[in-house]
């Protein structure tokens, strides 16, 4: 038996595979240096065995059959007895390859993949994200701070002073919208198709609402978003939205000045520059303008309807302020105006809607005039409620037809908008009733 083994060993010599060269690592740590020193001092045989690939102790046939192998080379006893092919394969170790330096998992994650282009040295993450956005949208995007500042800069750059200056009391008292009345010719010029003639629309609003947008901004949005924006774009095209926004800006600036007057009673003399005649005249003009907008075809836009409601709240607030501005005289008191007031207004007669506001009972006539002016506001609220009813019905019909079902957000916006519209109508009616009750009580006390 030993003779056959020696003969087999002579015909089939077992040669170890050539050693794999170990690459020199720049920095491997103390453990790798100690291992390399021990390998070099152990001799040539131990170095070749440790460095070379290892062979499995059992053959492939026995390992596949889950049987114990005799581990004889080149063929085990079981394979010789059954006439099977006996093959010893290399041992596959899990983990890193032998001779490769250790690298942290964090450094491996930062390495770029072989399939994608690696960014050149010196390129920051901003430029890399810019390239990704360029591949996504097909147009070069400038993500630097300078490019953002250049994109935001325009001839109509927004400044806080553009709106804060209007809130000052001096601008309020010098505003021609609340000092001088508008005649019929100016009223028709407001209602024309030119949005720039609407009570002096500010340049910022002209730029934001009147200039057409580029098609690239609309190409990014989907069909559902474009459908939801259709009514708003139609409202802008006929300038009704610009007119309502201009009215809202004027009333907001004036309301801020009124709040300043209520906090500082010493500003009462400056507030008197704004006469009751001018306030009532401009409120009537605004009510006529809003009534015409509600009758226009572009009022199918929900944004426009909401802005009409907000301006109506402002009008009711100014009627309430005018009704409460003059103090109620106690029994036995007599209203004696100052001499300066008599000198300034001795030759002036204030007449609105056939009511003469001068004389001893001027306060009562003013309150009666305000009570009469509330009737056009009530008609405006009725038109507003009718427009809301038609708008909600159109939205519900569009939802049933499947037009708004293309976008998942459309159904949520439908229910939300319906609730908002109903709440606006309820609040307008409640505010009008409360103001009418206060005016009637004030009239009884005079």
From Swiss-Prot:
Gene behind this protein: claE
Keyword Secreted: no
SUPFAM superfamilies referenced in this protein's UniProt entry, alphabetically: Zn2/Cys6 DNA-binding domain (SSF57701)
Biased composition (Low complexity): 34-51, 113-130
Key words, A-Z: DNA-binding, Metal-binding, Nucleus, Transcription, Transcription regulation, Zinc
Name the record gives this protein: Cladofulvin biosynthesis regulatory protein claE
Any single Gene Ontology cellular-component annotation: nucleus
Job description of the protein: Transcription factor involved in regulation of the gene cluster that mediates the biosynthesis of cladofulvin, a conidial pigment not required for virulence but that plays a role in fitness and resistance to environmental stresses including UV light and low-temperature stress.
